[in-house]
């Protein structure tokens, strides 16, 4: 995800950024389909878009159960990661430390 953010930020203009967040096909894993939509929302906020793409609000872009993308299911770090998950990921049932969205 951090690489996608870095790639987005390196794009030269708004038209290229808008193309970057066009709807991708569903991959068939509810958690990752939701994560991709949340990432698109994150990128739209970074790019100061007026609105997010309609596809990011489709029902199949929400996970039916909580998904911890960067933690084992029984990790003691869940509370910490939950606190640091951006709201547009939480809203889709995807828990991901905001640090996973930054390249170092």
Give residue ranges: language-model regions:
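Helix-turn-helix/homeodomain-like alpha-helical modules used for DNA recognition
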Residues: 1-41
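Charge-dense, extended regions
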Residues: 44-104
